[in-house]
C-alpha cells in the first residue's frame, strides 16, 4: 500500500490534466451568472452496479439532464460507467487519478476515499452543501434530511469532520432463521448472544441436526457470512476499539485491547462447541446454501442478500430478526455494522463540470430519486422523508392490493397480509439504524479488514499455531510493515 501511494503521488506531480484532476484551478464555486450555456458539460460517473441497477440510474440521469437544461440552460450529459465490482472500481479510479483523468463523481466506500485523499483528488463538499444557490435543503443538525448514521459516514476522514461523501445505497447485517424449526421446537427469536447459544445447544438435540451429520454434511448452530465484519462487530459490541485517530490525527490500529481479546476468545470457545461457524468452515463464500439445506438453523448475512437465504422450493419460511447483541447492552452500547456505498465528488479543473457533478449528486440523492431507487432496489432508504413516505410504508406493509390499488380485505374486514422476507428485512434492518457504527477510514484501513478476516480464520481453523494473542500480534506486525 505504501509503495502504491508513493507512486500515485509521484505520478500526480508529473501529469497535466485537462478536465477533472487532482490540482484544481481554484476553489471557487461558479455563480449562476458564470455558467457557460454555450457548451455541453459532461459529467462522468463511475460505479460498480449491475445491469438492473444501471437502468434505474439511467432513468434518474435522464430526468436530471432535462432539469438542468430547464433550470440553467445547460446541456449536461452524465456518462455512467460500471467497473463491474468494487475492487476494480477502486483500482481504476486510483490509476485514473495518477493519469489525471479521474471521473467527476464516483460510488465509493470509505477506504476508497481515504486512498483518493492521498492523491489530493477528492473535493471537500462542505462549501457546496452550505451554498445559498446549490446547497442541500434542511439543517445540519438534522443531517440535511438523511438518516443520521448514514450521513455521519461522510465525515470520518479527519478529526475536523470534513465531508467528502454523501449516502447513496445502504444495507446492514441481520439474523436469518428457519421459522419452521423455531415454531416446531418452540424456540424464541434470539435477541442476545446468550440467546443464540442457547438455541445452538438445543439445535444439537434435534432430529434435523442428527440427519445432517449422518449425511456427512457440515453443521453449526449459527453461520457467519463475513468474517471481516464479524471481527469488527464483536470488538465493537464487547466495548473495544478497532481503528481510530491518534493524538496527531493519524490513523491507528487499535484492536489490541482486552475487550477485543475477550470477544475473540468467546468466539473460539463457541466454535469449539460447534455453535458458531463461519463460511470458511462450510467451504463457501456465504452460509446461505447451508442454511437452506437445514445444516444451520440461523445465519447472519447482508440485508441486501436476503433473497439468497429464502428457499426457492418453499421448504421453509425464512424469518428475519435484528443482529444479536451482548446481554445487558444499553441502547448506546448496541452495535450493528452499516454497509453500502456513498458518492464522492472529485477535484476538477473545469469548475463547471465540478459544479454539475455536485448538482448530479444532489439530484441523485434528493427525495424523488431516492424514493425511486429504494422502491426499485433491495437497498434501504437513505433519507428520513423516504422512509416515512406513504409509498415506502405501503411497500413494506406486506399488505396485498388489488389491481386498482386497494387493499384486499379478509373475512374479518382487515387488510390481508402476505409475509415477505425481503420486505421484512427492510423493516428490521432499518430499525437498527440507531445502532449503526462506522469505522474511521485512512490509508491502510482496508488492509485492517483483511487482517481481521485472517485473524478469525487463524484462531478458528489453525488453533495449533494461533492463539488470539499471537493472531493479533502478527496482524499488527503485518500492518506496520505494509
Q: What name fits each language-model region?
A:
Residues 200-201, 248-281, 323:
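Glycine-centered hinge/linker elements that transmit conformational signals in sensory
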Residues 183, 403-482:
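Conserved C-terminal helix/tail region of periplasmic/extracytoplasmic solute-binding proteins
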Residues 1-42, 473-482:
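Short, low-complexity disordered leader/linker segments with a strong preference
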Residues 31, 110-172, 213-215, 234-236, ...:
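Hinge/lid segment of periplasmic solute-binding proteins
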Residues 126-146, 213-214, 220-222, 240-262, ...:
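Short, solvent-exposed loop/beta-turn-alpha elements that line the ligand-binding surface or hinge
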Residues 70-149, 180-191, 288-290, 297-298, ...:
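Extracytoplasmic "Venus flytrap"/periplasmic binding protein-like
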Residues 153-168, 173, 197-252, 268, ...:
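Extracytoplasmic/periplasmic solute-binding protein
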Residues 72-74, 99, 162, 185, ...:
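Extracytoplasmic/periplasmic substrate-recognition and gating elements
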Amino acid at each position: 500500500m505504501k509503495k502504491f501511494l508513493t507512486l500515485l503521488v509521484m505520478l500526480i506531480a508529473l501529469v497535466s490534466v485537462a478536465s477533472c484532476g487532482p490540482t484544481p484551478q481554484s476553489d471557487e464555486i461558479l455563480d449562476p451568472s458564470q455558467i457557460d450555456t454555450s457548451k455541453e458539460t459532461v459529467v462522468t460517473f463511475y460505479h460498480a452496479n449491475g445491469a438492473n441497477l444501471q437502468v434505474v440510474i439511467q432513468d434518474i440521469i435522464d430526468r436530471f439532464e432535462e432539469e438542468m437544461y430547464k433550470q440553467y440552460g445547460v446541456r449536461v450529459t452524465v456518462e455512467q460507467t460500471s467497473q463491474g465490482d468494487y475492487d476494480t472500481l477502486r483500482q481504476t479510479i486510483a490509476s485514473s487519478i495518477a493519469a489525471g483523468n479521474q471521473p467527476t463523481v464516483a460510488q465509493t466506500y470509505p477506504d476508497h476515499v481515504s486512498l483518493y485523499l492521498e492523491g489530493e483528488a477528492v473535493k471537500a463538499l462542505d462549501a457546496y452543501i452550505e451554498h445559498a444557490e446549490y446547497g442541500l435543503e434542511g439543517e445540519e443538525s438534522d443531517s440535511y434530511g438523511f438518516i443520521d448514521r448514514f450521513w455521519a459516514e461522510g465525515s470520518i476522514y479527519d478529526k475536523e469532520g470534513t465531508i467528502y461523501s454523501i449516502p447513496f445505497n445502504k444495507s446492514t447485517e441481520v439474523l436469518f432463521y428457519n421459522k419452521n424449526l423455531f415454531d416446531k421446537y418452540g424456540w424464541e427469536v434470539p435477541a442476545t448472544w446468550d440467546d443464540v447459544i442457547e438455541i445452538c445447544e438445543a439445535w444439537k438435540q434435534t432430529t434435523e441436526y442428527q440427519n445432517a451429520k449422518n449425511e456427512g454434511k457440515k453443521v453449526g448452530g449459527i453461520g457467519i457470512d463475513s468474517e471481516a465484519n464479524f471481527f469488527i462487530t464483536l470488538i465493537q459490541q464487547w466495548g473495544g476499539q478497532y481503528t481510530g485517530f491518534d493524538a496527531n490525527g493519524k490513523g491507528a490500529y487499535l484492536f489490541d485491547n482486552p475487550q477485543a481479546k475477550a470477544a475473540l476468545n468467546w468466539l473460539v470457545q463457541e466454535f469449539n462447541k460447534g455453535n458458531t461457524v463461519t463460511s470458511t468452515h462450510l467451504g463457501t463464500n456465504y452460509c446461505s446454501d447451508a442454511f437452506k439445506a437445514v445444516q444451520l438453523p440461523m445465519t447472519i448475512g447482508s440485508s441486501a442478500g436476503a433473497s439468497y437465504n429464502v428457499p426457492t422450493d418453499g421448504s421453509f419460511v425464512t424469518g428475519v430478526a435484528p443482529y444479536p447483541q451482548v446481554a445487558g447492552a444499553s441502547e448506546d452500547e448496541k452495535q450493528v455494522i452499516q454497509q453500502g456505498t456513498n458518492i464522492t465528488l472529485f477535484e476538477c479543473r473545469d469548475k463547471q463540470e465540478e459544479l454539475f457533478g455536485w448538482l448530479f449528486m444532489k439530484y441523485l440523492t434528493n427525495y424523488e430519486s431516492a424514493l425511486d431507487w429504494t422502491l426499485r432496489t433491495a437497498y434501504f432508504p437513505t433519507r428520513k422523508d423516504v422512509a416515512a413516505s406513504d409509498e415506502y410504508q405501503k411497500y413494506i406493509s406486506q399488505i396485498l392490493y388489488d389491481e386498482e390499488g386497494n387493499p384486499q380485505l379478509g373475512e374479518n374486514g382487515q387488510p390481508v397480509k402476505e409475509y415477505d422476507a425481503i420486505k421484512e428485512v427492510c423493516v428490521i434492518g432499518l430499525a437498527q439504524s440507531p445502532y449503526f457504527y462506522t469505522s474511521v477510514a485512512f490509508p491502510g484501513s482496508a488492509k485492517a479488514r483483511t487482517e481481521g478476516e485472517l485473524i478469525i480464520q487463524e484462531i478458528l481453523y489453525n488453533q495449533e499455531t494461533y492463539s488470539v494473542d499471537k493472531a493479533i500480534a502478527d496482524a499488527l506486525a503485518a500492518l506496520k510493515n505494509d
